[in-house]
Design a protein with these regions (language model features):
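General beta-strand structural signal in soluble alpha/beta enzymes
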Residues: 54, 129-135, 179-182
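Active-site-lining helix/loop region of Rossmann-like oxidoreductase modules
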Residues: 152-217
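Short, structured coil segments at secondary-structure junctions
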Residues: 89, 125-126, 174-175
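Short beta->alpha connector loops
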Residues: 72-75, 136-138, 160-162
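Rossmann-fold NAD(P)-binding glycine/threonine-rich loop
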Residues: 97-146
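NAD(P)+-binding Rossmann beta1-loop-alpha1 motif at the extreme N-terminus of oxidoreductases
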Residues: 1-44
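Rossmann-fold NAD(P)-dependent oxidoreductase module
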Residues: 14, 18, 124, 170
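Rossmann-like NAD(P)-binding element
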Residues: 46-92, 98-105
Length: 217
């Protein structure tokens, strides 16, 4: 499978590295084709089972059969403007970002309550199959869930059932066992709005290596 990873930060690096290690073809895209972070990633994954290359956001979107949005959530929609909508049409777009704003000194969400980043992307690119997932865990947990002991859950939502099935299969490649399908993309609101409690727990624990577990009768 060919994956286009949009974003050269820590999230994009972690996911692109995991995909390459699993043997997939990966292109990391940034604002420029020669971004220093992308170049560092390319050097790091040399010798992985999969193939790796770098380019712009537009290059990665054109290359990938499945696209991962790993851009900073507050800047995602602006970043996606550089992508040709036709290069997203019919493709799965996995959105792992949260619309976070730290400019006031505390964390807030730039999109909240009656909307979400996941929904905003789906509206902007209606021909894409947006699937929201992995946005409720730290990057280390995203790609290596067993780092958190015991059973714990990952959420997924989106409009296209087939797309969610394909993303679920990828998540299982990552090692995820319990994946809860919340339904349509509107439920991205719920997962994005877990960020305040996630951040509070991170502050209390002094570590991001934790996750949520849903228990029912």
């Amino acid at each position: 499978m060919k994956y286009g990873v949009l974003g050269t930060g820590m999230v994009g690096d972690a996911l692109a590295t995991k995909l390459a290690q699993l043997g997939h073809e990966v292109m990391m895209g940034g604002r420029s084709a020669d971004h220093k972070n992308a170049q560092a990633w390319l050097a790091k994954v040399r010798g992985a089972k999969g193939t790796a290359r770098i380019g712009t956001f537009a290059d990665a979107a054109k290359f990938g059969e499945t696209i991962l949005n790993c851009t900073q959530g507050s800047a995602t929609l602006e970043a996606l403007k550089s992508v040709d909508a036709q290069d997203l049409a019919g493709k799965i777009l996995i959105d792992v970002a949260n619309p976070l704003d730290f400019s006031s000194g505390t964390m807030t969400l730039t999109i909240v309550n009656s909307d979400s980043l996941g929904e905003s992307i789906q509206r902007a690119y209606p021909a894409a199959k947006v699937v929201k997932t992995l946005n409720t865990v730290n990057i280390q947990v995203m790609v290596n869930p067993v780092i958190v002991p015991g059973d714990h859950d990952l959420f997924i939502c989106g409009e296209d059932a087939g797309a969610k099935q394909q993303v679920t299969a990828l998540l299982r490649e990552f090692g995820w066992r319990s994946i809860i399908d919340l339904g349509g993309i509107v439920n991205a609101r719920a997962t994005e709005q877990l960020m305040p409690i996630w951040m509070r727990l991170f502050t209390m624990f002094g570590s991001p290596l934790f996750n949520f577990k849903i228990v029912k009768t």
